[in-house]
Amino acid sequence: MDNPQSKLWSLQYQIKINPNVSPSISKFHQGISYYDYLKQIHQVRKPSSYFEIGVETGATLAFAQCRAVAVDPKFQFQGNPIGRRTETYLFQLKSDDFFSQHDLKKFLPDGVDFAFLDGMHHFEYLLRDFINTEKYSHKDTVVTLHDCYPVNTEIANRDMNYDHRTDVVTRIWWAGDVWKLLPILRDFRPDLDVAVLDCPPTGLVVVQGLDPNSDTLIKAYDEIIAKYRDITLENYKIEQFRTEFSTTDSRRFFQPDLLKNFLTFRI
């Protein structure tokens, strides 16, 4: 029996997504695919260290040309995700287990230059992944979050519920409720620089200005979970969400010179 989620990953990684095939997509995500944008960040920024949670096929991991650490509970590599890298550390673990068992500095002594967080699609998991990754950040670290800008409410539930979808195009998509990271970071970490790029299929969030010494989210963790656990995008209202968190045109910041102005860099 085919796995609907595997079909989704295959669709995304082949980059066959046409923003015009669904009104819900074309209206809100007309930019560069998240896949191509991540590749461009690697090529332009040339990070010296890379960290990824939620690797699965290894398609985005393959972009890294530097020392890399990758975490996924079940790797499903397609092709060679290592390439010419001399150091790649693979951990087939849940991200919580990775952070409880390992010190990321052991593998990335100078911290994380660039990170892509695309793990479990429940907001508390992404929140913990963000908290734990920020501990290894420096002033110029760039952290990207996937699936935080769903095109409709059907794909934004905690449960997949494929059988109750009405949008033909997004019927097998699942972003989960990680969209909640946007109001959480806005309310609890206004010091961060957060941009939402209109990258199909479900947006790409770029976070900069990180502070490895911040304990704000850790101290507020229980409060955050209690506040957001039972909120759905239906009762939050997707129109309100889109008003509060408008997207940035990813095409404006795709060319190397413009992308350099968008991202911070180590000198």
What are these model-derived regions, one by one?
Residues 1-116, 120-267:
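A short alpha-helical cap/connector motif
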